[in-house]
Amino acid sequence: VIHQGNGGLSAARNAGLDAARGDLLAFIDSDDTIHPEMMARLYQALSSSNAQMSVCNYALVDEKGAMDRQGVQAIRDEVLEGKANILQKLEDGNWYWVVACTKLYRKELFRTLRFPLGKLHEDEFVIHHVLLGCDKVACISDALYYYFQRSDSITGSAYSLRRLDGAQAQFERAQTLLDNGMPPSSAYH
């Protein structure tokens, strides 16, 4: 257990990264839940395909506990191979690919990466770096992560200038992908 003051989600994730001793990492937001078999299924998909990352689908859960699988842009059971195929998922404009919490990662992907402190949309600042480190990504179509949507959450709150962090993350992602030879259409979505 790590005891530290509230420094936000990035600080908590970074503390976990710094203290991690195993070979695999996962991030679960404190107000969300997971299927009891999520980690075992992600591990099996990752290890059987020798992938650097595995990912599952998610379901939205409202404040009354009702689960909505209809609004989710589902992924299919597949193993993505090659950076171009993996990074293509960012071009699809699917929010699903930029969140950290539906995935199991090999720790080596975060060897030099940390989440930016004081930013909203912190996942979006690092996901392209993570995906650039992957040669294979194993995908599971089942919704094993339950994303709790609160009306007073950061993503559900009224506009503020801090919401521009998402635009900054997208710009940095576009620049990084362009620097790594991705065509402009891939970089700007």
Indicate where each model-derived feature is located.
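Nucleotide-sugar donor-binding/catalytic module of glycosyltransferases
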Residues: 1-168
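C-terminal, non-catalytic tails of nucleotide-sugar-dependent glycosyltransferases
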Residues: 81, 168-188
